[in-house]
From Swiss-Prot:
The chain crosses the membrane at residues 19-39, 61-81, 104-124, 151-171, 177-197, 223-243, 255-275, 303-323, 352-372, 381-401, 407-427, 433-453. The keyword Cell division does not apply. The gene is kup. It catalyses: K(+)(in) + H(+)(in) = K(+)(out) + H(+)(out). This is Probable potassium transport system protein Kup. Coiled coil: none annotated. Belongs to the HAK/KUP transporter (TC 2.A.72) family. InterPro entries: K+_transporter, K_trans_C, K_trans_N, Kup. It is a multi-pass membrane protein. It comes from Lacticaseibacillus casei (strain BL23) (Lactobacillus casei). Pfam families: K_trans (PF02705), K_trans_C (PF22776). It is found in: Cell membrane. Its main location: membrane. GO terms for cellular component: plasma membrane. The keyword Nucleotide-binding does not apply.
Length: 684
C-alpha cells in the first residue's frame, strides 16, 4: 500500500508518575465522586437516621465492596481493558472489533452508546449539586454561606454554565491541574475514611460476602432488592474507565486503580462506622439533604472538604463532557450519527469540541437541575441508563472472546455471570423509572431513534443504490482525454476532484461522469476521484492511488482512522507532490502565483447533494426513514466542512436520490386531429 502520509498511530503510553497523575484526572472522575452520594442514597432509601442497625450498614458496605470488585475490577479492569482497538476502549471501539461477526451487533452498540450519552447528561448535574449542597448551613465569619436550596441551584447553574462555556477554548491549561487535584481528593477520601474506620475495626467483617447476600433478604432492609439501585451508584464510572483507556493507556489504569479502589473502600467503610455510631441521633433527620460524607468530617475542615469536593465534581463533569465528545465523534465515524462540526481547540491528541453537543449537554444539565432541584431527586434517576450500557458491553465482550477463540466455557461463563448480575442491577434500578429515571430513558430513546434513523436509513440507501447505474472509468477514458485537450472549452480548473465511492477499482456512479461531460463539460488537466475509507483502527493515515495508465485520471483511496480528521484538501496536496516526485503525474507550473516555483495548479472540488426523487418506489416505512434521514442532514455539517474543504474552491450540485425500481411511463403521441377529438374538461 503506497503511503505518503505520516501515520499518526496510537501513542505508546509510558507508565510514569506524570502519566499516573493524568490518569487520576481523566479516568476516575465519575467513580471517584460516588462517595458523595452513595451512602446518602442508601440511608435515605431506608428511612433516614434511626431506621437502620449495624447489620444493615455492614451489609450495605459489603455490597459496595463486592460490586466494585466484581463489576469494576474484574469485568472492566481485568477483562474489558484487554479488548482494545489499537489502544482505544469503550463500547464503540469494542463494536468495531466484533461487527464482522454479525450484522445485528450494531443494535447493542447503538443502545449502549445512547444510554451512556443519556446518563452522561445527568452526571454533571448530580455531582456538582451534591457538592454545593454541602455548603448549606456552613458558617464563614459568623455568616451562613448558603441557607436554602434555591441558592444551591443558582450556584450549581453558574458552575455548570462556566464549565460548558470554557469548552470552546480547550481544557489543556486547567486539565494539567486535574491530576494533582484528584490525587489530593483520593488521598483525602482514604485518610478521612481510615480515621473513621479506626474507631471500629469490626466493620471490616463486611469483606465477607455473606453479609452482602444476607442484607438482600434481611427484614432490616426496607428496600429489599431495590437497595441495589443505590449500591450500583458506586460503580457507574466503570464504563467511563473503559472508554477513557485510549487517553492514558491500559498500564496506567492497571497501576492506579488499586490505589483509587483502596481509597474509595476506606471512605465507604468510614462512613458506615460514623453512621453506626450516630444512628440514634435523630436530630440529623432535621438536616435538609443530610449527607454522611460531610457530616463525618470535623467542623474545622468541612469547608475545605466541600471546596475540594466541588473541584472533584467539576473534574468529573469535565471528564464526562470530554467523553461525550469522543463518543459522538466515534458514532459519526461509524455512521451512527450525522456529521457534526468538530473543532480541535488545542494540539493535544484526542481533545476535541463539538459545538452542537456542547449546547445540548448544557441545556440538558440546566433542565435537569431545574426539574429535579435537589441531588436526592437526581439520584432517583441516576444509574438506570448505565445498567443498560453495561449489559450491552457484556454482550459485545462475549462476542469479542468468541472472536479471539477463547474456550466456549469461558466466553459463555463470562456472558452468563456478568449478565445475571447486571440484570439484577437493572431490575433493581427499574424502580427509578417512576422516580425520575424516565428522564434519562426518554433522552436515551431520542438518541437511539436518531442513531437508528441515520444508520438504517444509510443502509436502505446503500442497498438500493449499489445497483444504480454504474459506469466504468475505462469506458470514458478517451472522452476525458479529448475533453482535457479540447480548445473549444475553456479550462474549468487544473485539478477537478469528486468525493465518491469507487467499486471494483474502476466503477463509479454515472451521475459523476454526467456532471463532468453532460451537465457542463468541465475541462481539467487531472480528474481526481477520492474515496475516504474509515478504518477500525483509530489513527490510520494511509492511501493508495491508481492512474489507470494515464496521467490525467487518479483514483485515490484514503484510509483514515475513526478518530482522524478528514482533511482531504491537505492530504491531496501531499499526494500530488508525492506522485509528481515519482513521475506518475507531470508538474503543473503556474505562470501567476505568489509561491516561487509553484508546481501544483489550482483545485476545484465538486460536492454532490442528494434529494429524494418523487420517482422513489420503496415501502412506506423505509421511505419514512429515508425522509427522516434527509431531514437530519439539515443539522449535519456540510460536506465541505466535514472533508476539510472550508477554504477550498467547492461547487455544490444537486442530484436526485432514486430508490427502488423506477416505474417507466410511456407517452403515446397523438396527431393534431386526435388531440382535437379528445373530450375537454368541463368547468364546474
Amino acid at each position: 500500500m503506497a503511503s505518503g502520509l505520516t501515520a499518526n498511530k496510537k501513542l505508546r503510553h509510558k507508565i510514569t508518575a506524570a502519566a499516573l497523575l493524568v490518569t487520576l484526572g481523566v479516568v476516575y472522575g465519575d467513580i471517584g465522586t460516588s462517595p458523595l452520594y452513595v451512602m446518602k442514597s442508601i440511608v435515605a432509601g431506608n428511612g433516614g437516621m434511626g431506621h437502620f442497625d449495624t447489620d444493615f450498614l455492614v451489609g450495605s458496605v459489603s455490597l459496595i465492596f463486592w460490586t466494585l470488585l466484581i463489576i469494576t475490577t474484574v469485568k472492566y479492569v481485568l477483562i474489558a481493558l484487554r479488548a482494545d482497538n489499537n489502544g482505544e476502549g469503550g463500547i464503540f471501539a469494542l463494536y468495531t472489533l466484533v461487527r464482522q461477526r454479525a450484522r445485528w451487533l450494531v443494535l447493542p452498540a447503538m443502545v449502549g452508546g445512547a444510554a451512556l450519552l443519556a446518563d452522561g447528561m445527568l452526571t454533571p448535574a448530580v455531582t456538582v449539586t451534591t457538592a454545593i449542597e454541602g455548603l448549606k448551613g456552613v458558617h464563614i465569619n459568623g455568616n451562613i454561606l448558603i441557607d436554602n436550596q434555591q441558592q444551591v441551584i443558582w450556584v450549581t447553574i453558574l458552575i455548570i454554565t462556566f464549565l460548558f462555556f470554557i469548552q470552546r477554548f480547550g481544557t489543556d491549561l486547567i486539565g494539567k491541574a486535574f491530576g494533582p487535584i484528584m490525587f489530593v481528593w483520593f488521598t483525602f477520601l482514604g485518610v478521612a475514611g481510615f480515621i473513621a474506620l479506626s474507631k471500629d475495626w469490626s466493620m471490616l467483617r463486611a469483606l465477607n460476602p455473606y453479609y452482602a447476600l444476607h442484607l438482600l433478604v434481611s427484614p432490616d432492609n426496607k428496600m429489599g432488592l431495590f437497595i441495589l439501585g443505590s449500591i450500583f451508584l458506586a460503580t457507574t464510572g466503570a464504563e467511563a474507565l473503559y472508554s477513557d483507556m485510549g487517553h492514558v493507556g491500559r498500564g496506567n489504569i492497571y497501576l492506579s486503580w488499586p490505589y483509587v479502589n483502596i481509597c474509595l473502600v476506606l471512605n465507604y467503610f468510614g462512613q458506615a462506622v460514623w453512621l453506626d455510631q450516630n444512628s440514634k441521633v435523630t436530630a440529623f433527620n432535621k438536616i435538609t439533604d443530610f449527607n454522611p460524607f460531610f457530616q463525618m468530617l470535623p467542623e474545622s475542615i468541612r469547608l475545605g472538604a466541600i471546596i475540594l469536593a466541588t473541584l472533584a465534581a467539576i473534574i468529573a463533569s469535565q471528564a464526562l463532557i470530554s467523553g461525550s465528545y469522543t463518543l459522538v465523534s466515534e458514532a459519526i465515524k461509524l455512521r451512527f450519527l450525522p456529521r457534526l462540526h468538530i473543532i480541535y481547540p488545542t494540539r493535544l491528541k484526542g481533545q476535541l469540541y463539538i459545538p452542537v453537543v456542547n449546547t445540548i449537554l448544557w441545556l440538558a444539565c440546566l433542565a435537569i437541575i431545574g426539574y429535579f432541584k435537589t441531588s436526592a431527586e437526581m439520584e432517583g434517576a441516576y444509574g438506570l441508563a448505565i445498567t443498560i450500557t453495561m449489559l450491552m458491553t457484556t454482550l459485545l465482550l462475549y462476542q469479542y472472546l468468541r472472536s479471539r477463540h477463547a474456550p466456549a466455557v469461558i466466553a459463555i461463563g463470562t456472558l452468563i455471570f456478568f449478565s445475571a448480575i447486571e440484570t439484577v442491577f437493572f431490575i433493581s434500578s427499574a424502580v427509578k423509572f417512576l422516580h425520575g429515571g424516565y428522564v434519562t430513558a426518554m433522552i436515551a430513546f431520542i438518541i437511539l431513534a436518531v442513531m437508528y434513523v441515520w444508520q438504517y436509513g444509510g443502509r436502505i440507501r446503500d442497498d438500493n443504490t449499489y445497483r444504480a447505474e454504474m459506469a466504468s472509468l475505462f469506458a470514458y477514458k478517451n472522452q476525458l482525454s479529448e475533453l482535457r485537450n479540447d480548445p473549444d472549452y475553456p479550462t474549468y480548473t487544473t485539478n477537478l476532484v469528486y468525493m465518491t465511492q469507487i467499486a471494483n477499482d474502476h466503477y463509479i456512479k454515472k451521475e459523476i461522469l454526467y456532471s463532468i461531460l453532460d451537465k457542463r463539460p468541465k475541462r481539467a488537466r487531472v480528474y481526481w476521484f477520492v474515496t475516504v475509507n474509515v478504518t477500525d483502527e483509530p489513527y490510520t493515515a494511509e492511501y493508495t492511488t491508481d492512474t489507470y495508465g494515464t496521467d490525467y485520471m487518479v483514483n485515490v483511496q484514503l484510509y483514515l482512522g475513526f478518530r482522524m480528521e478528514q482533511q482531504v484538501n491537505v492530504f491531496l496536496r501531499q499526494i500530488v507532490n508525492d506522485m509528481m516526485r515519482e513521475g506518475e503525474l507531470p508538474t503543473q507550473p503556474q505562470k501567476y502565483t505568489t509561491i516561487p516555483d509553484r508546481q501544483v495548479g489550482d483545485w476545484t472540488f465538486v460536492l454532490l447533494h442528494e434529494e429524494l426523487s418523487p420517482q422513489t418506489q420503496i415501502k412506506g416505512f423505509q421511505k419514512a426513514i429515508i425522509q427522516a434521514r434527509l431531514r437530519l442532514q439539515h443539522i449535519a455539517v456540510s460536506p465541505a466542512q466535514w472533508f476539510g474543504l472550508e477554504y477550498a474552491d467547492t461547487i455544490d450540485e444537486t442530484v436526485p436520490l432514486v430508490l427502488g425500481k423506477i416505474p417507466i411511463t410511456k407517452l403515446n403521441r397523438l396527431t393534431r386531429s386526435q388531440a382535437e377529438a379528445q373530450p375537454e374538461d368541463e368547468d364546474d
